[in-house]
Each structure stands twice: as C-alpha cells, then as structure tokens.
Amino acid sequence: MLEIKNLTKSYGDVLALDRFSLDLKKGEVLGLLGPNGAGKTTLISILSGTVGGFTGTVNFRGRNLFADREIKNRLGIVPQDMAFYDELSAMDNLLFWGGLYDVPRADLKKRAVELLELVELAARAKEPVKNFSGGMKRRLNTAIRLLHKPDLLLLDEPTVGIDVQAKVSILDIIRGVGAAGTAVIFTTHQLAEVETTCSRVAIMDRGRVLAQGTLDELVRIVGERDVVDFMGDFAAAAFSDAVRELAGERIELLSAADGLASLAVRDTAEVPRIMDRLFQRKIAVTDMKIKSPNLETVFLKLTGRTLRD
C-alpha cells in the first residue's frame, strides 16, 4: 500500500532523513521507534505535505503521493497540535470537519456517531469540548482524522502529554483502526507502546531505518537468543558436562554455578531436548525460567544506545 524509497531530507548541514526506505501493507500497524532527532517527525511532516525540499519517492496505492491529490486525500493525519472549536460540542466538531473532508451529508451523522463510540465519547457527544480532559481531546482529534475513512493513518507521538488511562485508550483505538483494515504509522520513543500495539516495527536512528519487521523477525536479524535459566540441586561441573555435547550453533552454555546455570538457545523448541539430557545425567532441576529477547534488547543491539541516551 505504501512504498517509500530513498527519502532524503536535510536542514542545512543536518541530515534528517538519509535514504529512508519503508514498505507498509493494508491493515498493518507500524510503530516507528527512535530517539529524539532520529527523523520520525520529519518523515510524518513530509508524508503529510507540510515539509518539502526532499529527494526520493513515495508511492501510495501504486501512485505518486505528492502528484495525485485524489490519492493524498486517502490519508488521515493526526498531528500533535489539535484543531477543533472548544465552544462546540464533540458532535458539532465532527459534523464541521466532516463537511471539510467532503463526507457525504447523508452519511455524516451516522459516521460521527460511529466514531464517537469508537473513541468512547458517545456519552459526552453534546458537551462542549472545552470541558474535556487532554486525553479526551486527543481521542476526539483522532476521531476527526478518521471521518473520511482513510486508507492510511499517520500519528506523530499520539500519547505525549496525556495520562496512563488516556494512553491506553489511544492505543486501543490504533489497534482497532488497524484491525478494520486501515494501515497505521505512529511515531514513538516508548518501547512498551510498540510491543503491545504494533504488528510491525521500524527502528530508526540518525535518519535511517536500521531494521523493520515483526519483533520475532527483528530478533532474528540481530541474532539475539532466548536465555534459559536452570535452578536446582546440582554442581556446576556436573551441569556443564551434561550439556557439553549439546552445545553448538543452537545451544550455548552462558554460565554455570552450583545450583544455577544459564543456556542461550536459538529456539525454545530445544528446551525439551535439554531437559531430557539433564534427566539422563541425573541433574536435579527444580525450576526453569525462559527469558525472551525484547524490543529494548533489539534496539540496543542495533543502535548501540538506549532510547534514553
């Protein structure tokens, strides 16, 4: 649905995007993850048409996004700055914006009702927006950008500056939009948001995509492995001897001490084979824990720094 190739943008001597490339399919929710200055907001600004002076191509549904007004109207853009009238009700704001989006008048009221239910504001549809909390306003802002049923929704840091409950609501909305078939790109520097919300992840740093895919695919790209900890009544030497013949490309002994040992495995399907060997060697294991690589591990491996650096 969306194909970005070699997108490059500079601000003076600063390279904000460096041959940025990305693909997105219908219904995919892609989290664009990176530290401040990675180029996330620049990308959203280019796609939304507010920043020019770049090179590269962006095709949306097989057509040039910037040369085809009709295709560009299939985007929904949710900026951090919210645009609505505080004195009007939530419903009246939706009706006003629906007119600007050329939503057919016969369909507009029904669409507004559907969206107020989606963002959990139906009970306060007739209330002036000035009475809403920051999180409620953020949800209404998202509803407005969904009025024309876009094929692609762009959100720049949608959970910044709102409380935890409001963040949960926004992320639920994003998941629901993706499940309904709309492709979504949202920028964030919050690992947990990406892990719980996205079907795919793109990790950015210094204007480039370092890797993209599902979390499992990213783990394979960086070569991270699951770590299995074994606890029990055994000697370090006995445990090491027991697993030595299993060690290889798929299994590695990381550490062994009396009563505690750790193995790295390429696939947790190896665990039953390991347990069989330990049982055969009479290694008394009383507990076992599997620690899978997470997004923070992958990010650190790719960038050499944490999001907080």
What are these regions (language model features)?
Residues 56-71:
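Conserved ABC transporter NBD signature motif
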Residues 35-39:
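Walker A (P-loop) phosphate-binding loop of ABC-type ATPase nucleotide-binding domains
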Residues 153-157:
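Catalytic Walker B motif of ABC-type/P-loop ATPase nucleotide-binding domains
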Residues 171-265:
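ABC transporter nucleotide-binding domain
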